[in-house]
Amino acid sequence: MKKKGLNYLMQVAIDGPASAGKSTVAKIIAHNLGYIYIDTGAMYRACTLIAHDNNVDYGDEKAILNLIDHSTIDFKQEDGEQKVYVNGKDVSIDIRTPEITENVSQVSALRSIREKMVELQREMAGKHDVIMDGRDIGTTVLPDAEVKIFLIASVASRAKRRFLDFQEKGIHQDLKDIEHDIEVRDYKDSHREISPLKKADDAIELDTTNLTIDEVVAKITEIIQKKQKN
């Protein structure tokens, strides 16, 4: 564990492909254990939204970095939910639209953008007990995390989860299109040059295809609590 003053900080890394359930279970566990939850995917989505709203090409690394350097990305807890703010505006729904979802992989693959976000993520993890989820937390962002989890699930089950999540948010997209988008996203995330989606050698793999959220939460919580006792 990392030491902060007289106390020790716990770092939990949860990685996996799109819609494997990372954010959902991470939020619940963080709430139950009193940890800070850091949604790294939301940070890259916010960067993508910033580019979109300023009519900047998603591959224009220099322009996007300049925009980010002059923007603020914040997380706030409101009514029991984590909200994402960009320059003081709540963009929690805006960053989940199909447009942003389809292009976040391109933005997150840009070296300087990734370096900037990783720097911010490590800074956050050095101040609190954290649960951080993403694609490269256990391999790149927090390689020394005490607990590393790698969640997987079938494309069909992940597409259904995203479809239902979109419905709740009032976003309409065909299920087959979502399945295709997930397959494309998986390929991009796994084959990008910088910090590709990859299971850390010391990560524990959990297949969530046939597990309920409560079951996944229970399994990961047990792993964390065992580590705390050591």
Swiss-Prot record:
Protein name per UniProt: Cytidylate kinase
Keyword Transmembrane: no
Native organism: Lactobacillus johnsonii (strain CNCM I-12250 / La1 / NCC 533)
UniProt keyword Cytoplasm present: yes
Gene Ontology, cellular component aspect: cytosol
GO MF annotation list: ATP binding; CMP kinase activity; dCMP kinase activity
Source domain of life: Bacteria
Main localization, broad class: cytoplasm
InterPro entries listed in its UniProt record: Cytidylate_kin, Cytidylate_kinase_dom, P-loop_NTPase
Record PANTHER family: CYTIDYLATE KINASE (PTHR21299:SF2), CYTIDYLATE KINASE/PANTOATE-BETA-ALANINE LIGASE (PTHR21299)
HAMAP family noted in UniProt: Cytidyl_kinase_type1
Catalysed conversion reaction: CMP + ATP = CDP + ADP; dCMP + ATP = dCDP + ADP
Key words, A-Z: ATP-binding, Cytoplasm, Kinase, Nucleotide-binding, Transferase
NCBIfam families for this protein: cmk
EC number assigned by the record: 2.7.4.25
Disulfide bonds: none
Family from the record: Belongs to the cytidylate kinase family. Type 1 subfamily.
Binding site for ATP: G16, P17, A18, S19, A20, G21, K22, S23, T24
GO biological process: nucleobase-containing small molecule interconversion; pyrimidine nucleotide metabolic process
Subcellular location field: Cytoplasm
